[in-house]
Amino acid sequence: MNSSLTSFLFAIFFVSVTATKLLRLYLNAHGFPVLVFVVCLPAFFLADVILISAVWALICRKNGGLGLFGFAVGCVICVVTLGAASSQLGFYYHTGGELDWGDATKFAFSEDGRKVLLSEGATPLSFACAILLLSWIVKSRLSKLVSIIVSSGAVHARSALRWVATRTYSKSKFDKAETESSLLPTREHDSDSDFLYDSDDANTDITHNETPGQPGSENVGGRTIYCPRFVTGGYTMLVLLALLCIFTIFNHDRPYNRMFTTLPLPLLAVFAPKPVECSSSSWPLPALIEKVRWEKQNGNYKGWAPGSANEVIEKYRQRVPDWLPSELPYGFARWSQDSKSEDVQTLLHNTTLSHDDGCADPLILDPYYNPANDPMKITNLDNPFLEPLQQIMQERSVKIKHIALILMESMREELFPLQQGTGFHDLIMKSHDELDHDDINELLSHISPNSERITGLEGNWMGQNGTSFGRQFSEWNDETKPGFGGINIRGALTTSSVSTKSLAAVHCGTWPLAVDMFEEAEAESYQPCLPQVLELFNRIKANTSSDDFREQQWYPAFFQAVTDGYDRQDKFDDKMGFKHIVNKKRIKQDALYNPELEEINYFGFPETALKSYITDYITNATANNQRMFMSHFTSTTHHPWATPKWFNASEYMGTAHGLMQTHKDLNSYLNTVRFTDAWIGQLMQILDEQGISNETLVVFVGDHGQAFKEDVSKTGTYGNPHISNHRVPITFRHPQLPRVQHQVNATSLSILPTILDLLVSTDSLNPKDTAAAADLVQDYEGQSLIRPFKATHKGRRAWNYSLVNPGGRMLTITSSDTPWRLVLPLDKKTEYIFSDLGSDPMELELVLEWSLSSLASTVRRKHSEEAADWLREAEKVGLWWASERKRLWKYNPS
């Protein structure tokens, strides 16, 4: 083979493997004590040495059929490793995390997923060029060095074999073998070696002193046999491996397996089957569900008696509500007659996990969600309304004819709205010189003015002399009376940092499925989604065009300016029951006749492209005496944070502590937040112009947050459990509702039951619909946010769960009664993380350990015994919760 090509290929492989291994060591070194890391460091490179040697052997074979085949295999390995290394380095550059190759494959097989992967393709390409350049520079010297090492190793290996032979065989056998062939190195080089020394290189000379009596030598048959240095090195390596085994056995919580892994071995994850974990419904805290704690049925409340079969849960299983129509809409399977008639054997055959995976169903009599048998169920519907709402609810003066649900992509709570003096504002100001602060604050005051009016939270924007900045509101002429505007939730969390999973939770009132990607799209929601509930109302009453809006039919629509084909979102949208959908595909068809419409990113168009569609929808619905449920998913605040060409971007981040490029992503994100705020103002103005503002409930919620390197070293949502990815705004906007700032540690799971509670409490449904809604709202797991929230009930905590993108690796857990937060590694491949959001709201002082026992010990020492007990409890209920979601979603991984 061409020696130059061979050297270059090997250099590519060597540089790729070495660069990614050093990165892996850097990312995981904090998981080891310094002494352990230093002692084990040589052993961590063992797999790398073996792989590099194997590739060297493949591409350095001599001519012939076998040699040519080996060279071809080696070439493929080198090229694949180059691509993998550049991708891994590029991923770390952008996110600060490690790339999972199984996930990369899922993206690669999806058209929209490929667009995501290619959106930052310049970075991996740059790393690939850097690797190629470095490989070209070092190829000759590297090849020569490796040749020397391999040749020397071969010689010493033969010496070692010969030395072992002298220890094993008798002198006579040794002499006999000596007459046949000698394996010992002598003063002459071994000419049989596949690798030749450069005779001009003094460093390659290997000589042997044969001085009798030299330490480490043995005289056999008149000839001195030396203990080769290879054996000494081998003993050293064996000692290191022994120490590593001891460390592993006595401290197996450390990530030793991660340190041994090296490219291209992780690529095998592409071919790995989905892991199958059987669910178990055994509640881990049995003392909390003892019979003395059971609750009887009371009105629409179904009672609560989880555990073994009993009258309370059996009554719910067999109930057939009076409001049930003859033809059930999709989503109401558990109320059908067929679900009541199955015997035990039929249930066993059809139930949740009776599949080829060998898992048995632990709750055979409950194939559907049963609120009476839910150990975590806490209802607050028996509480009165929040004090500011009580009078207006008694007067029944609020009218809710229409509902708009605005799901805002990557919207952080701190930016809805941005307020002067907050931690996020301080983060921005640190990038500016103090002399520029007034100018920057005036600029920042224009980021979220409409969000201020929606939430009722003032931005408090003023100069250093105390003078407020004057602002103009060009998008929305809000005429809401002072003291009114609705309920703003402070302290809310998302249920998942995966957009599609969050969308399902918001629309259906369900916890997400703790598996990677949007597998919920392949199943039926275990709770009726809001469009399905509205379709139930349509079927309960006659289809008339009555002037009484409570007798009118609901017309649900979904608007999204980008693709809904990513990870099967379109499939789930259809299942939810939207009758009118506008997405990128529809807009792109119309864009042929409207050249002003432009795509701004790999997903699609800006939200402003939807303005005419939304206006037409409202106009037609009001003309046809229909009640509207309009769901709108924004997208501009998604990576890559691009805005239309006509939008005037601003420089919000400064250069006081580095170049502007340092804050490029956050600056782009802030511009998209301002764009989204302006768009929201336009939406609210449309409602005003259509004359429906006073009868429309508008719900604003973020699907998840967005972490930047200004927050934490690891950016984005993928594999990143940082709190900035999970805090979201939630606001129930209505101009006739009193303004309420409700501080509560809840999640977006509570949105759907709150909407139903509002419809019932404001007399916005006819009697039949009211009966159905008042009954259904008791079946959802979330509490109502227009009533005092129950943080605990009879010793039970109100637990909050949030999955980390991509969904099946990490689960974050909080409870409404404490400020503590646990990150639970469901896949056992990452660290346990504890934080106290009360004293450390931005999670700057995390506690990380590789086992729960170690974490509990550290938390007990740094925080309190109570906190340590809490995290043990959180881990137990978290694991139960994850498996229970698989049962309820009827998840079949096969």
Question: PLM features: residue spans?
Answer:
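Short, solvent-exposed loop/turn segments at secondary-structure junctions
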Residues: 408-413, 495-497, 511-513, 561-566, ...
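Substrate-binding rim/cap in mid-to-C-terminal beta-strand-loop elements of soluble/periplasmic
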Residues: 487-513, 656-657, 715-769
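Beta-strand elements within well-structured catalytic alpha/beta cores of enzymes
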Residues: 396-417, 534, 627-635, 673-676, ...
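Transmembrane and membrane-interface helices of multi-pass
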Residues: 1-334, 892-894
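Phosphate/adenylate-binding glycine loop and adjacent helical scaffold
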Residues: 594-599, 603-605, 763, 767-894
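Active-site rim elements
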Residues: 38, 515-521, 597-602, 665-671, ...
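Histidine-centered active-site microenvironments of extracellular/periplasmic hydrolases
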Residues: 419-423, 688-737
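Active-site-proximal alpha/beta segments of enzymes that process anionic O-linked groups
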Residues: 212-213, 254-405, 410-657
